[in-house]
């Protein structure tokens, strides 16, 4: 059975890139368009990994990650922050919110798959 990855990303182009990349690598992808939908889909599907954009409407990725990590049923799901916020201190901010990894946009497909495989084992 292939691993399920929840992609929480408001930009359709970025979701499409990740959809193509993850499906070619043999992963199943679930999509959410904002942080609030991401929390709901995490609860519904219990994915093996969450790729979380940070800057989104409705609820940002930091808040969505905090809510996921506060839920005992979801706490163990690893979250990778995927963000264009590649400034000094942003990786630490993502870590403090509960993210288990960090990938800056734009990312190379090889870089993203390496991080996904590192986290999923």
What are these regions (language model features)?
Residues 16-24:
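Charged docking surfaces used in two-component/phosphorelay signaling
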Residues 56:
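Receiver (REC) domain active-site loop signature in two-component systems and cognate sites
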Residues 45-51:
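Active-site beta3 strand of CheY-like receiver
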Residues 9:
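Conserved acidic carboxylate
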Residues 107-116:
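C-terminal output helix
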Residues 26-33, 41:
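Short hydrophobic/Thr-rich beta-strand motif most characteristic of the beta2 strand and flanking loop
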